[in-house]
């Protein structure tokens, strides 16, 4: 099945739709690339996402994430170790990880199927945090589904946030989808005004990230 085969609505809203099962899961299950901008990420959100996306392991699927620069301390420590091992095998012994989802996340990272960059505002006009909420699914036919509006990055069926998303497809609304794609690619290649985009490890080693034990997210 491809993205075009899905029966997608133009909008999903929590009071009348199951956003996760009706939109996110079908799109994730039928894409080969998923691009996402989000205000924050955690070990739990990434491990849940990659564990549920079976085709990322079976095919040459990939995920590109652009996140804001706030992290829970333990999340940042774990993510730094996982991505550091990808580049310097042997620094981090992944065998000590007991959580199956995190083990799967480690494998996805080591196989270069997950890339993470950090967006940091660098202008007096935009001096807070990066909070853009946009996503793009692409399938084997090069069809695209784009969306905006949700802060849910895990696509966990236990998510209880009230939210709504607007959906655009390349076969019905190509101009809007092209704008979303261009916006993401400009961010990814650091060509967007008012923000600077860095590789996760570079941002961490350059002390550009904000972190606190109070920004806690359960990783179990």
Q: At which residue positions do the language-model features occur?
A:
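PLD/PLD-like phosphodiesterase catalytic module centered on the HKD motif
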Residues: 1-220
């Amino acid at each position: 099945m491809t993205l075009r085969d899905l029966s997608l609505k133009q909008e999903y809203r929590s009071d009348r739709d199951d956003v996760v099962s009706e939109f996110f899961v079908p799109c994730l299950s039928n894409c080969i690339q998923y691009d996402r901008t989000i205000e924050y990420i955690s070990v739990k959100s990434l491990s849940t996402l990659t564990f549920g996306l079976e085709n990322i392991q079976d095919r040459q699927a990939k995920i590109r994430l652009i996140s804001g620069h706030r992290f829970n301390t333990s999340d940042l420590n774990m993510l730094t170790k996982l991505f550091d091992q990808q580049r310097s095998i042997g620094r981090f012994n992944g065998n000590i990880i007991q959580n199956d989802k995190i083990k799967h996340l480690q494998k996805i990272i080591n196989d270069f199927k997950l890339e993470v960059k950090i967006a940091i505002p660098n202008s007096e006009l935009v001096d807070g945090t990066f909070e853009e909420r946009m996503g793009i699914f692409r399938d084997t036919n090069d069809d695209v589904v784009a969306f905006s509006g949700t802060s849910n990055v895990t696509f966990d069926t236990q998510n209880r946030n009230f939210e709504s998303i607007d959906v655009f497809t390349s076969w019905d609304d190509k101009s809007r989808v092209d704008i979303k794609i261009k916006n993401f690619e400009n961010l990814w290649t650091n060509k967007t005004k008012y923000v600077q985009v860095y590789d996760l490890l570079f941002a961490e080693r350059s002390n550009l990230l904000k972190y606190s034990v109070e920004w806690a997210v359960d990783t179990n």
